[in-house]
Regions:
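Enzyme catalytic cores with a strong preference for nitrogen-chemistry domains
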Residues: 1-299, 312-316, 326, 351
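ATP/NTP-dependent adenylation/nucleotidyl-transfer catalytic domains that generate, transfer
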Residues: 146, 212-213, 238, 264-302, ...
Protein backbone atom coordinates (compact mmCIF):
# COMPACT_ATOMS: atom_id res chain seq x y z
CA UNK A 1 0.00 0.00 0.00
CA UNK A 2 1.33 3.39 -1.03
CA UNK A 3 0.46 6.16 1.43
CA UNK A 4 0.65 9.89 0.76
CA UNK A 5 1.27 12.23 3.68
CA UNK A 6 -0.61 15.47 2.94
CA UNK A 7 0.89 18.25 5.06
CA UNK A 8 -1.52 21.09 4.27
CA UNK A 9 -1.88 24.71 5.41
CA UNK A 10 -5.62 25.26 6.01
CA UNK A 11 -7.51 28.48 6.73
CA UNK A 12 -9.56 28.04 9.89
CA UNK A 13 -13.27 27.88 9.12
CA UNK A 14 -12.87 27.78 5.32
CA UNK A 15 -14.34 24.33 4.86
CA UNK A 16 -14.85 24.60 1.11
CA UNK A 17 -11.40 26.10 0.56
CA UNK A 18 -9.76 23.46 2.73
CA UNK A 19 -11.66 20.75 0.85
CA UNK A 20 -10.21 22.15 -2.36
CA UNK A 21 -6.71 21.96 -0.83
CA UNK A 22 -7.30 18.33 0.10
CA UNK A 23 -8.72 17.46 -3.30
CA UNK A 24 -5.69 19.00 -5.04
CA UNK A 25 -3.40 17.00 -2.74
CA UNK A 26 -5.33 13.82 -3.53
CA UNK A 27 -5.06 14.37 -7.26
CA UNK A 28 -1.31 14.95 -6.97
CA UNK A 29 -0.95 11.85 -4.79
CA UNK A 30 -2.95 9.79 -7.29
CA UNK A 31 -0.57 10.73 -10.10
CA UNK A 32 2.28 9.48 -7.88
CA UNK A 33 0.62 6.10 -7.39
CA UNK A 34 -0.77 6.60 -3.89
CA UNK A 35 -3.74 4.50 -2.73
CA UNK A 36 -4.37 6.21 0.62
CA UNK A 37 -3.87 9.88 1.48
CA UNK A 38 -3.49 10.77 5.17
CA UNK A 39 -4.32 14.35 6.20
CA UNK A 40 -4.04 16.17 9.56
CA UNK A 41 -6.41 16.46 12.50
CA UNK A 42 -9.58 18.51 11.78
CA UNK A 43 -8.20 19.07 8.29
CA UNK A 44 -11.43 20.49 6.88
CA UNK A 45 -11.83 22.97 9.74
CA UNK A 46 -8.22 23.98 10.29
CA UNK A 47 -6.91 23.75 13.83
CA UNK A 48 -7.97 25.20 16.22
CA UNK A 49 -11.49 26.15 15.05
CA UNK A 50 -12.54 27.10 18.59
CA UNK A 51 -16.14 28.37 18.79
CA UNK A 52 -16.64 28.05 15.04
CA UNK A 53 -17.36 24.42 15.90
CA UNK A 54 -20.56 25.58 17.61
CA UNK A 55 -22.07 27.07 14.44
CA UNK A 56 -24.70 24.80 12.86
CA UNK A 57 -24.16 26.31 9.42
CA UNK A 58 -20.49 25.36 9.45
CA UNK A 59 -21.30 21.84 10.64
CA UNK A 60 -23.60 21.47 7.64
CA UNK A 61 -20.88 22.87 5.40
CA UNK A 62 -18.49 20.15 6.61
CA UNK A 63 -20.96 17.46 5.53
CA UNK A 64 -21.28 19.16 2.14
CA UNK A 65 -17.48 19.29 1.82
CA UNK A 66 -17.15 15.59 2.65
CA UNK A 67 -19.85 14.73 0.12
CA UNK A 68 -18.00 16.81 -2.48
CA UNK A 69 -14.72 15.04 -1.74
CA UNK A 70 -16.41 11.65 -2.07
CA UNK A 71 -17.88 12.68 -5.41
CA UNK A 72 -14.64 14.07 -6.86
CA UNK A 73 -11.97 11.81 -5.36
CA UNK A 74 -9.97 9.94 -8.02
CA UNK A 75 -11.11 6.36 -8.51
CA UNK A 76 -9.21 3.84 -6.42
CA UNK A 77 -7.96 6.44 -3.95
CA UNK A 78 -9.01 6.79 -0.30
CA UNK A 79 -8.56 9.80 1.98
CA UNK A 80 -8.21 9.63 5.76
CA UNK A 81 -8.70 13.02 7.38
CA UNK A 82 -9.66 14.68 10.63
CA UNK A 83 -13.29 15.82 11.03
CA UNK A 84 -15.79 16.76 13.70
CA UNK A 85 -18.55 14.20 14.25
CA UNK A 86 -21.96 15.03 15.70
CA UNK A 87 -22.88 12.97 18.76
CA UNK A 88 -26.13 10.97 18.56
CA UNK A 89 -27.76 12.97 21.38
CA UNK A 90 -27.98 16.60 22.47
CA UNK A 91 -25.94 16.27 25.62
CA UNK A 92 -23.13 18.84 25.68
CA UNK A 93 -20.50 18.76 24.39
CA UNK A 94 -22.13 17.25 21.34
CA UNK A 95 -19.15 16.54 19.07
CA UNK A 96 -16.34 14.03 18.69
CA UNK A 97 -12.91 14.87 17.31
CA UNK A 98 -12.77 12.10 14.73
CA UNK A 99 -11.12 10.60 11.68
CA UNK A 100 -13.15 9.87 8.54
CA UNK A 101 -12.38 7.67 5.56
CA UNK A 102 -13.49 9.12 2.22
CA UNK A 103 -13.75 6.87 -0.82
CA UNK A 104 -15.37 7.30 -4.18
CA UNK A 105 -19.08 7.64 -3.53
CA UNK A 106 -19.13 7.97 0.26
CA UNK A 107 -17.45 8.56 3.60
CA UNK A 108 -17.63 7.25 7.16
CA UNK A 109 -16.14 7.96 10.58
CA UNK A 110 -13.56 5.30 11.50
CA UNK A 111 -11.99 6.56 14.76
CA UNK A 112 -12.54 9.04 17.57
CA UNK A 113 -9.93 10.93 19.55
CA UNK A 114 -9.47 9.44 23.00
CA UNK A 115 -7.34 11.99 24.86
CA UNK A 116 -8.67 15.54 24.70
CA UNK A 117 -6.11 18.19 25.69
CA UNK A 118 -7.52 20.86 27.97
CA UNK A 119 -4.41 22.69 29.14
CA UNK A 120 -2.37 25.67 27.96
CA UNK A 121 -3.78 26.78 24.57
CA UNK A 122 -5.93 23.67 24.19
CA UNK A 123 -9.57 23.55 25.28
CA UNK A 124 -10.99 20.51 23.49
CA UNK A 125 -13.31 19.42 26.30
CA UNK A 126 -15.28 22.59 25.65
CA UNK A 127 -16.35 21.09 22.31
CA UNK A 128 -15.67 17.35 22.22
CA UNK A 129 -16.44 14.13 24.03
CA UNK A 130 -13.66 11.54 24.23
CA UNK A 131 -13.93 8.37 22.20
CA UNK A 132 -14.07 5.09 24.11
CA UNK A 133 -12.73 2.54 21.61
CA UNK A 134 -9.30 2.10 20.00
CA UNK A 135 -9.27 3.12 16.36
CA UNK A 136 -8.63 0.28 13.92
CA UNK A 137 -9.37 0.35 10.19
CA UNK A 138 -9.11 -2.70 7.94
CA UNK A 139 -8.45 -2.00 4.26
CA UNK A 140 -8.16 -4.62 1.52
CA UNK A 141 -5.35 -3.89 -0.90
CA UNK A 142 -3.27 -6.06 -3.21
CA UNK A 143 -4.76 -9.25 -1.85
CA UNK A 144 -3.88 -8.29 1.71
CA UNK A 145 -5.96 -6.98 4.58
CA UNK A 146 -4.11 -4.03 6.10
CA UNK A 147 -4.83 -3.37 9.75
CA UNK A 148 -4.38 0.36 10.32
CA UNK A 149 -4.30 1.69 13.86
CA UNK A 150 -5.60 5.25 13.97
CA UNK A 151 -5.14 7.82 16.65
CA UNK A 152 -5.35 11.59 16.71
CA UNK A 153 -2.60 13.92 17.91
CA UNK A 154 -2.74 13.78 21.73
CA UNK A 155 -3.46 10.04 21.65
CA UNK A 156 0.26 9.55 20.96
CA UNK A 157 1.37 11.60 23.99
CA UNK A 158 1.19 8.83 26.56
CA UNK A 159 4.82 8.24 27.52
CA UNK A 160 5.18 9.87 30.92
CA UNK A 161 8.95 9.46 31.10
CA UNK A 162 9.32 11.25 27.74
CA UNK A 163 6.61 13.85 28.07
CA UNK A 164 7.59 14.72 31.61
CA UNK A 165 4.06 14.69 32.99
CA UNK A 166 0.87 12.68 32.89
CA UNK A 167 -1.75 15.08 31.62
CA UNK A 168 -4.64 12.67 31.39
CA UNK A 169 -5.64 9.06 31.95
CA UNK A 170 -5.78 6.34 29.33
CA UNK A 171 -3.30 4.75 26.96
CA UNK A 172 -4.61 4.62 23.37
CA UNK A 173 -1.29 3.27 22.09
CA UNK A 174 -1.24 0.44 24.62
CA UNK A 175 -4.83 -0.52 23.82
CA UNK A 176 -3.84 -1.08 20.18
CA UNK A 177 -1.19 -3.66 21.08
CA UNK A 178 -3.69 -6.52 21.33
CA UNK A 179 -5.14 -5.56 17.91
CA UNK A 180 -1.73 -6.00 16.21
CA UNK A 181 -1.89 -3.18 13.64
CA UNK A 182 0.36 -3.18 10.59
CA UNK A 183 0.73 0.60 10.80
CA UNK A 184 -0.16 3.35 13.24
CA UNK A 185 -1.52 6.48 11.56
CA UNK A 186 -1.46 9.62 13.72
CA UNK A 187 -3.44 12.62 12.45
CA UNK A 188 -1.97 15.67 14.17
CA UNK A 189 -2.27 19.40 14.59
CA UNK A 190 0.71 19.95 16.85
CA UNK A 191 1.88 23.57 17.13
CA UNK A 192 5.52 24.53 17.29
CA UNK A 193 7.37 25.01 20.55
CA UNK A 194 11.13 25.04 20.96
CA UNK A 195 12.35 21.48 21.48
CA UNK A 196 9.06 19.90 20.46
CA UNK A 197 10.23 18.39 17.16
CA UNK A 198 12.62 16.08 19.01
CA UNK A 199 9.91 15.17 21.52
CA UNK A 200 7.48 14.17 18.75
CA UNK A 201 10.08 11.80 17.30
CA UNK A 202 10.76 10.25 20.69
CA UNK A 203 7.04 9.69 21.33
CA UNK A 204 6.60 8.13 17.88
CA UNK A 205 9.63 5.90 18.43
CA UNK A 206 8.18 4.71 21.74
CA UNK A 207 4.83 3.91 20.07
CA UNK A 208 6.55 2.12 17.17
CA UNK A 209 8.54 -0.02 19.60
CA UNK A 210 5.46 -0.93 21.66
CA UNK A 211 3.37 -1.84 18.62
CA UNK A 212 6.15 -3.36 16.53
CA UNK A 213 5.07 -1.42 13.44
CA UNK A 214 5.83 1.84 11.62
CA UNK A 215 4.22 5.11 12.72
CA UNK A 216 2.93 7.54 10.10
CA UNK A 217 2.76 11.01 11.67
CA UNK A 218 0.97 13.71 9.63
CA UNK A 219 1.04 17.23 11.03
CA UNK A 220 -0.67 20.45 10.00
CA UNK A 221 1.50 23.33 8.81
CA UNK A 222 0.90 27.08 8.87
CA UNK A 223 0.03 29.91 11.22
CA UNK A 224 -3.42 30.22 12.78
CA UNK A 225 -3.56 33.25 15.08
CA UNK A 226 -0.98 32.76 17.86
CA UNK A 227 -0.26 29.13 16.99
CA UNK A 228 2.26 28.21 14.31
CA UNK A 229 2.29 24.62 13.07
CA UNK A 230 5.73 23.65 11.83
CA UNK A 231 4.77 20.55 9.84
CA UNK A 232 7.71 18.16 9.85
CA UNK A 233 5.52 15.09 9.21
CA UNK A 234 7.37 11.78 9.06
CA UNK A 235 7.26 8.00 8.86
CA UNK A 236 9.13 6.10 11.57
CA UNK A 237 10.05 2.43 11.35
CA UNK A 238 9.47 0.03 14.22
CA UNK A 239 13.20 0.30 14.88
CA UNK A 240 12.86 4.02 15.56
CA UNK A 241 14.61 5.04 12.34
CA UNK A 242 13.05 7.81 10.26
CA UNK A 243 11.96 6.40 6.89
CA UNK A 244 10.52 9.58 5.43
CA UNK A 245 10.75 13.23 6.50
CA UNK A 246 8.54 15.99 5.13
CA UNK A 247 9.42 19.67 4.94
CA UNK A 248 9.52 22.02 7.87
CA UNK A 249 7.41 25.19 7.98
CA UNK A 250 5.89 24.73 4.51
CA UNK A 251 3.25 22.54 2.85
CA UNK A 252 4.46 19.23 1.48
CA UNK A 253 3.20 15.94 0.07
CA UNK A 254 5.25 12.77 -0.14
CA UNK A 255 4.45 9.13 -0.88
CA UNK A 256 5.70 6.14 1.10
CA UNK A 257 5.29 2.47 0.16
CA UNK A 258 4.24 0.56 3.27
CA UNK A 259 4.78 -2.78 1.54
CA UNK A 260 8.53 -2.23 1.28
CA UNK A 261 10.81 -3.07 4.17
CA UNK A 262 11.26 0.21 6.08
CA UNK A 263 14.74 1.57 5.55
CA UNK A 264 15.85 4.23 8.00
CA UNK A 265 17.47 7.33 6.57
CA UNK A 266 19.70 9.96 8.06
CA UNK A 267 17.31 12.81 8.73
CA UNK A 268 18.71 15.15 11.37
CA UNK A 269 16.45 17.79 12.81
CA UNK A 270 17.07 21.38 11.65
CA UNK A 271 19.24 23.67 13.73
CA UNK A 272 17.00 24.98 16.56
CA UNK A 273 17.64 28.61 15.60
CA UNK A 274 16.85 27.89 11.95
CA UNK A 275 13.58 26.19 12.84
CA UNK A 276 12.69 29.07 15.18
CA UNK A 277 13.43 31.62 12.46
CA UNK A 278 11.43 29.77 9.81
CA UNK A 279 8.53 29.27 12.21
CA UNK A 280 8.37 32.98 13.09
CA UNK A 281 8.49 33.89 9.40
CA UNK A 282 5.69 31.42 8.64
CA UNK A 283 3.60 32.69 11.54
CA UNK A 284 3.94 36.32 10.46
CA UNK A 285 3.31 35.54 6.79
CA UNK A 286 0.18 33.52 7.49
CA UNK A 287 -1.18 35.94 10.08
CA UNK A 288 -0.93 38.76 7.55
CA UNK A 289 -2.21 36.72 4.60
CA UNK A 290 -5.11 35.11 6.44
CA UNK A 291 -6.15 38.48 7.91
CA UNK A 292 -6.07 40.12 4.48
CA UNK A 293 -2.86 42.19 4.75
CA UNK A 294 -0.17 42.36 2.09
CA UNK A 295 1.99 45.05 3.69
CA UNK A 296 3.39 45.76 7.13
CA UNK A 297 4.68 48.76 9.08
CA UNK A 298 6.95 48.91 12.09
CA UNK A 299 8.83 51.48 14.11
CA UNK A 300 12.61 51.17 13.75
CA UNK A 301 14.58 52.41 16.75
CA UNK A 302 18.09 51.17 16.15
CA UNK A 303 17.64 48.50 18.83
CA UNK A 304 17.85 44.76 18.41
CA UNK A 305 14.13 43.99 18.90
CA UNK A 306 12.87 46.17 16.05
CA UNK A 307 15.80 45.00 13.92
CA UNK A 308 14.77 41.36 14.33
CA UNK A 309 11.14 42.17 13.54
CA UNK A 310 12.27 44.01 10.40
CA UNK A 311 14.23 40.94 9.27
CA UNK A 312 11.24 38.68 9.92
CA UNK A 313 8.87 41.02 8.08
CA UNK A 314 11.15 41.27 5.04
CA UNK A 315 11.40 37.48 4.88
CA UNK A 316 7.68 36.91 5.43
CA UNK A 317 6.18 39.56 3.16
CA UNK A 318 9.01 40.59 0.86
CA UNK A 319 11.13 43.73 1.34
CA UNK A 320 8.93 45.74 -1.01
CA UNK A 321 5.93 45.22 1.27
CA UNK A 322 7.59 46.44 4.47
CA UNK A 323 7.92 50.04 5.64
CA UNK A 324 9.92 51.19 8.67
CA UNK A 325 9.29 54.51 10.39
CA UNK A 326 12.04 56.30 12.32
CA UNK A 327 10.73 58.68 14.99
CA UNK A 328 13.78 60.26 16.63
CA UNK A 329 13.45 62.34 19.79
CA UNK A 330 16.01 64.69 21.38
CA UNK A 331 17.28 61.62 23.28
CA UNK A 332 17.80 59.42 20.21
CA UNK A 333 21.48 58.86 19.53
CA UNK A 334 22.99 59.52 16.14
CA UNK A 335 24.16 55.91 16.16
CA UNK A 336 20.61 54.59 16.51
CA UNK A 337 19.45 56.57 13.49
CA UNK A 338 22.46 55.50 11.43
CA UNK A 339 22.05 51.87 12.46
CA UNK A 340 18.35 51.91 11.55
CA UNK A 341 18.97 53.34 8.09
CA UNK A 342 21.83 50.90 7.45
CA UNK A 343 19.63 47.96 8.49
CA UNK A 344 16.82 49.09 6.19
CA UNK A 345 19.28 49.38 3.31
CA UNK A 346 20.63 45.86 3.92
CA UNK A 347 17.08 44.49 3.94
CA UNK A 348 15.83 46.61 1.04
CA UNK A 349 12.84 47.98 2.98
CA UNK A 350 11.46 51.50 2.67
CA UNK A 351 11.90 54.02 5.47
CA UNK A 352 10.32 57.29 6.55
CA UNK A 353 11.29 59.70 9.30
CA UNK A 354 9.05 61.81 11.54
CA UNK A 355 10.93 63.62 14.34
CA UNK A 356 8.81 63.90 17.48
CA UNK A 357 10.43 66.86 19.28
CA UNK A 358 7.71 69.29 18.14
CA UNK A 359 4.97 66.88 19.18
CA UNK A 360 6.61 66.44 22.59
CA UNK A 361 6.67 70.22 23.01
CA UNK A 362 3.00 70.41 22.06
CA UNK A 363 2.06 67.88 24.73
CA UNK A 364 4.21 69.70 27.29
CA UNK A 365 2.38 72.94 26.53
CA UNK A 366 -1.07 71.32 26.61
CA UNK A 367 -0.40 69.60 29.94
CA UNK A 368 1.49 72.43 31.61
CA UNK A 369 -1.60 74.00 33.23
CA UNK A 370 -3.43 70.86 34.43
CA UNK A 371 -0.18 69.38 35.75
CA UNK A 372 1.09 72.71 37.11
CA UNK A 373 4.26 72.14 35.13
CA UNK A 374 5.62 70.09 32.26
CA UNK A 375 5.26 66.29 32.36
CA UNK A 376 8.27 64.69 34.02
CA UNK A 377 9.74 61.31 34.86
CA UNK A 378 7.84 58.25 33.71
CA UNK A 379 4.94 60.40 32.46
CA UNK A 380 7.25 62.21 30.04
CA UNK A 381 8.83 58.94 28.92
CA UNK A 382 5.46 57.31 28.28
CA UNK A 383 4.28 60.34 26.31
CA UNK A 384 7.14 59.81 23.87
CA UNK A 385 6.14 56.18 23.40
CA UNK A 386 2.48 57.12 22.94
CA UNK A 387 3.33 59.81 20.42
CA UNK A 388 5.20 57.20 18.41
CA UNK A 389 2.36 54.71 18.81
CA UNK A 390 -0.15 57.26 17.52
CA UNK A 391 2.00 58.07 14.49
CA UNK A 392 2.41 54.40 13.65
CA UNK A 393 -1.31 53.68 13.99
CA UNK A 394 -2.16 56.67 11.79
CA UNK A 395 0.18 55.55 9.01
CA UNK A 396 -0.93 51.93 9.20
CA UNK A 397 -4.58 52.98 9.14
CA UNK A 398 -4.16 55.35 6.21
CA UNK A 399 -2.00 52.98 4.16
CA UNK A 400 -3.76 49.69 4.92
CA UNK A 401 -0.76 48.10 6.61
CA UNK A 402 -0.44 45.60 9.44
CA UNK A 403 1.34 47.34 12.31
CA UNK A 404 3.90 45.07 13.94
CA UNK A 405 4.63 45.47 17.63
CA UNK A 406 8.31 44.90 18.40
CA UNK A 407 8.29 44.14 22.14
CA UNK A 408 9.85 40.96 23.54
CA UNK A 409 8.70 38.53 26.23
CA UNK A 410 10.99 39.93 28.92
CA UNK A 411 9.42 43.37 28.53
CA UNK A 412 5.88 41.98 28.48
CA UNK A 413 6.62 39.92 31.57
CA UNK A 414 7.77 42.79 33.77
CA UNK A 415 5.70 45.57 32.20
CA UNK A 416 8.68 47.39 30.68
CA UNK A 417 6.45 48.66 27.88
CA UNK A 418 3.83 51.37 27.39
CA UNK A 419 0.13 50.80 26.87
CA UNK A 420 -1.11 52.62 23.74
CA UNK A 421 2.52 53.30 22.86
CA UNK A 422 5.12 50.71 21.88
CA UNK A 423 2.53 48.00 22.62
CA UNK A 424 0.38 49.20 19.70
CA UNK A 425 0.01 46.82 16.81
CA UNK A 426 -1.88 43.99 15.21
CA UNK A 427 0.75 41.34 15.99
CA UNK A 428 3.55 41.10 18.56
CA UNK A 429 5.91 39.08 16.39
CA UNK A 430 8.58 38.37 19.04
CA UNK A 431 6.31 38.61 22.09
CA UNK A 432 7.25 35.05 23.11
CA UNK A 433 11.02 35.53 22.80
CA UNK A 434 13.00 36.55 25.86
CA UNK A 435 15.56 39.29 25.29
CA UNK A 436 18.42 36.80 25.57
CA UNK A 437 16.70 34.66 22.91
CA UNK A 438 16.47 37.72 20.66
CA UNK A 439 20.22 38.26 20.98
CA UNK A 440 20.91 34.56 20.32
CA UNK A 441 18.68 34.39 17.23
CA UNK A 442 20.15 37.59 15.78
CA UNK A 443 23.67 36.27 16.31
CA UNK A 444 22.71 33.10 14.41
CA UNK A 445 21.09 35.10 11.59
CA UNK A 446 24.35 37.02 11.12
CA UNK A 447 26.49 33.87 11.21
CA UNK A 448 27.70 31.88 8.17
CA UNK A 449 25.56 28.95 9.38
CA UNK A 450 22.43 30.89 8.40
CA UNK A 451 23.42 31.57 4.79
CA UNK A 452 21.36 28.80 3.16
CA UNK A 453 18.33 29.51 5.32
CA UNK A 454 18.53 33.25 4.59
CA UNK A 455 18.72 32.57 0.87
CA UNK A 456 15.72 30.23 1.04
CA UNK A 457 13.76 32.99 2.79
CA UNK A 458 14.59 35.54 0.10
CA UNK A 459 17.15 37.42 2.19
CA UNK A 460 20.74 38.23 1.30
CA UNK A 461 22.85 35.15 1.94
CA UNK A 462 26.15 36.93 2.53
CA UNK A 463 27.23 39.52 5.06
CA UNK A 464 25.46 40.64 8.19
CA UNK A 465 21.76 41.47 8.24
CA UNK A 466 21.12 42.65 11.78
CA UNK A 467 24.61 44.05 12.09
CA UNK A 468 27.28 44.00 14.77
CA UNK A 469 26.54 47.57 15.89
CA UNK A 470 22.94 46.68 16.71
CA UNK A 471 23.78 43.30 18.26
CA UNK A 472 26.41 44.73 20.59
CA UNK A 473 24.60 47.91 21.60
CA UNK A 474 23.50 48.05 25.28
CA UNK A 475 19.68 47.80 25.36
CA UNK A 476 18.03 51.21 25.82
CA UNK A 477 14.59 52.72 25.25
CA UNK A 478 16.29 56.14 24.72
CA UNK A 479 13.49 58.00 26.48
CA UNK A 480 15.86 60.09 28.63
CA UNK A 481 19.56 61.02 28.44
CA UNK A 482 22.01 58.10 28.77
CA UNK A 483 19.21 55.65 29.59
CA UNK A 484 19.88 51.90 29.77
CA UNK A 485 17.42 49.05 30.38
CA UNK A 486 19.68 47.99 33.25
CA UNK A 487 18.79 51.23 35.05
CA UNK A 488 15.30 49.83 35.64
CA UNK A 489 15.73 46.06 35.35
CA UNK A 490 18.22 43.36 36.30
CA UNK A 491 20.58 42.40 33.50
CA UNK A 492 18.74 40.17 31.03
CA UNK A 493 21.19 37.31 31.61
CA UNK A 494 19.94 37.36 35.20
CA UNK A 495 16.31 38.30 34.56
CA UNK A 496 15.38 35.85 31.82
CA UNK A 497 16.22 32.60 33.67
CA UNK A 498 14.12 33.87 36.58
CA UNK A 499 11.22 34.68 34.28
CA UNK A 500 11.42 31.28 32.62
CA UNK A 501 11.34 29.60 36.02
CA UNK A 502 8.32 31.65 37.11
CA UNK A 503 6.39 31.44 33.82
CA UNK A 504 7.20 28.19 32.04
CA UNK A 505 8.20 26.12 35.06
CA UNK A 506 5.61 27.74 37.37
CA UNK A 507 8.04 27.83 40.26
CA UNK A 508 7.46 30.10 43.25
CA UNK A 509 9.86 32.73 44.61
CA UNK A 510 10.26 30.55 47.70
CA UNK A 511 11.43 27.61 45.57
CA UNK A 512 13.89 29.84 43.72
CA UNK A 513 15.23 31.31 46.95
CA UNK A 514 15.72 27.80 48.34
CA UNK A 515 17.94 26.96 45.36
CA UNK A 516 20.15 30.02 45.75
CA UNK A 517 18.36 32.92 44.06
CA UNK A 518 18.68 36.24 45.88
CA UNK A 519 15.49 36.72 47.91
CA UNK A 520 15.01 40.40 47.11
CA UNK A 521 15.52 39.75 43.40
CA UNK A 522 13.08 36.82 43.30
CA UNK A 523 10.37 38.78 45.12
CA UNK A 524 10.92 41.85 42.96
CA UNK A 525 10.65 39.97 39.67
CA UNK A 526 7.55 38.09 40.85
CA UNK A 527 5.96 41.42 41.83
CA UNK A 528 6.74 42.96 38.45
CA UNK A 529 5.27 39.92 36.69
CA UNK A 530 2.07 40.07 38.73
CA UNK A 531 1.55 43.84 38.43
CA UNK A 532 2.00 43.84 34.64
CA UNK A 533 -0.97 41.55 34.05
CA UNK A 534 -3.28 44.46 33.12
CA UNK A 535 -0.90 45.45 30.34
CA UNK A 536 -0.68 41.94 28.91
CA UNK A 537 -4.48 41.70 28.86
CA UNK A 538 -4.45 44.57 26.34
CA UNK A 539 -1.42 43.48 24.32
CA UNK A 540 -1.43 42.51 20.66
CA UNK A 541 -1.64 38.78 19.89
CA UNK A 542 1.76 37.14 19.66
CA UNK A 543 3.34 34.13 17.97
CA UNK A 544 3.70 31.29 20.47
CA UNK A 545 7.09 29.57 20.30
CA UNK A 546 7.58 28.44 23.92
CA UNK A 547 5.82 25.95 26.15
CA UNK A 548 3.97 28.80 27.87
CA UNK A 549 3.29 32.14 26.25
CA UNK A 550 1.32 35.26 27.17
CA UNK A 551 -1.61 34.26 24.96
CA UNK A 552 -4.76 32.17 25.22
CA UNK A 553 -2.97 29.65 27.44
CA UNK A 554 -2.06 32.28 30.05
CA UNK A 555 -5.13 32.76 32.22
CA UNK A 556 -4.08 34.88 35.16
CA UNK A 557 -6.35 37.29 37.04
CA UNK A 558 -5.50 40.99 37.10
CA UNK A 559 -6.69 41.89 40.60
CA UNK A 560 -5.09 39.12 42.63
CA UNK A 561 -2.37 38.23 45.08
CA UNK A 562 0.28 35.58 44.58
Amino acid sequence: MRLALAQINPLVGDLSGNAALLLAACRTAHTQGAELVVAPELALWGYPPRDLLLRPALRRRQVEALDQLAAELPSGLALLLGVSEAAPDRQQPDLFNAAALVQSGGWRVVARKRLLPSYDVFDERRYFRPGDQPGLLELEHGGRCWRLGINICEDLWVEEELHGQRLRGGDPVGELQALRPDLLLNLSASPFAQGKAQLRRRLAAAAAARLGCPVVYVNQVGGNDELVFDGGSFVMAASGAVCLQLAWAEPDLQVWDAALAPAGTTSPLPDPEELLLRTLVLGLRDYARKCGFRRALLGLSGGIDSALVAVLAAAALGPGNVQALLMPSPWSSAGSIEDSLALAQRLGIATGTVPIAALMAGFDAALNEPLAGAPAGLTAENLQSRIRGTLLMALANQQGQLLLSTGNKSELAVGYCTLYGDMNGGLAVIGDLYKTSVFRLCAWIDSPAAAACRQALGLAAEGELVGRAIREKPPSAELRPDQRDSDSLPDYDQLDPLLKALIEEQRSPEELIATGTDAALAERVQGLLRRAEFKRRQAAPLLKVSNRAFGSGWRMPIAAAG
